Amino acid sequence: MLEYYNDADKESVYENYVKIVSKPKNINDVSITQMITEVLKQFNSKRFLYNLCCSKELTFLKNILNNEIDEDDFLDYMFEIKTLSKKFIFDQDNFCIFSEQIDNVKYAIKKFNKYGAKSDEYIYPISILRIVGFLPLEMFKSANYENTKYERKLTFEEYLSNPLLKFYTTIYEENDEKYICYANYYELIPEIEEERKNYINFKSLTSNKYLIEEMFYYGFPIYNKKVKKMYEFINQNIPYIIDYVDEARVLNDYSTVERFLKDDKARKIINEGLEYSPSCALYGLSPVDYLDLKDSE
């Protein structure tokens, strides 16, 4: 694993390192070798990998161990490969589990076969944050922790320390109030807040099962035909712009991605898909749903 990461960009390694270890060091005080050492030390806790992965990832790892899939199946497992690589579990260049993680994976699969994926229970709150961007921590606590089975078994701090939840979220403070956000959107929060000044908060966010699952796995509600067409078009033709398309969705700002598009067909497919994708700037509504609510006022 050290050889794999020694040539990697330090900032990219650090971005994932802070999501894994319980007490990360400042980027200027830690080398890549030290980061990998600390990551592996974190994985020494036997249940850590099991709690860090959702059912899709554990099923993928199980299939890898059983030699049931190989690199020819790459496009069918983009979510699993991307996330497990970021979690220091899967070597996507050689399409294999890192040797240092084999025993941890075997233990996790044994738990998965017996109990299922316990961390799947955290998919809902993670998806809501991906849809709306951020929430006051007290609101998040009220919606996901208070008066639930978690409150009877765990302190709120213990609930927040779940490895899967911690991997996808960041807690920060603004104007003496704590907030929790989808981690990848932390740098976009000032822009989200600025964009929201142009829109009404209808407080009518709906979240069906398909929306929740697909926002977690794909970042887009691909059960919608136009969104699915957009998602498949991007992955098959211009996969390198997927993060820019996601940013366009978050900010409801098509210019974020349009500058990369010279083809009218691509522009049309992507814009139509974004029209049906929930935007953080629109308080979690899609542009189409937002306009429908505005027109019905």
Predicted features along the sequence, with ranges:
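Basic helix-extension-helix modules of the SAP/HeH family
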Residues: M1-S99
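DNA-recognition alpha helix
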Residues: Y14-V18, M139-N147
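Accessory beta->alpha helical hairpin/"wing" motif in late/C-terminal subdomains of nucleic-acid enzymes
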Residues: N26-Q42, K86-G116, T170-E193
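Short capping segments at the starts of secondary-structure elements
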Residues: S55-T59, L65-D72, I128-M139, I222, ...
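Charge-enriched amphipathic alpha-helical scaffolds
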Residues: D76-D91, Y145-N175, R249-Y290
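N-terminal membrane-targeting/insertion segments
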Residues: E121-E138, K149-T155
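Long, charge-rich C-terminal accessory regions
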Residues: L154-S255
